């Protein structure tokens, strides 16, 4: 969430970026936390300000006790489409899901 990128985190990320490392973010789409266009747009913009590329947005893995955070894939796809309409391509993360038995993440959008 963009609110997690405070001054302390920004300074730490700057030190890493200044060393020449490429910084990539992986976030999980969570109901009630970051499942709005405003939240995701703010996160992407804040990450870029900190020189971090918004790389992956994960569909939540089905785990016990977390069903209340699950966002439907249809809504996730809609959010990515909305991000594409208001941000440059490099600021839109790949929407992915890990599927049982698959060796790699499955790109949803």
Where are these regions (language model features)?
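Conserved AdoMet/S-adenosylmethionine-binding subsite of the radical SAM
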Residues: 1-75, 79-86
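C-terminal accessory regions of radical SAM enzymes
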Residues: 77-109
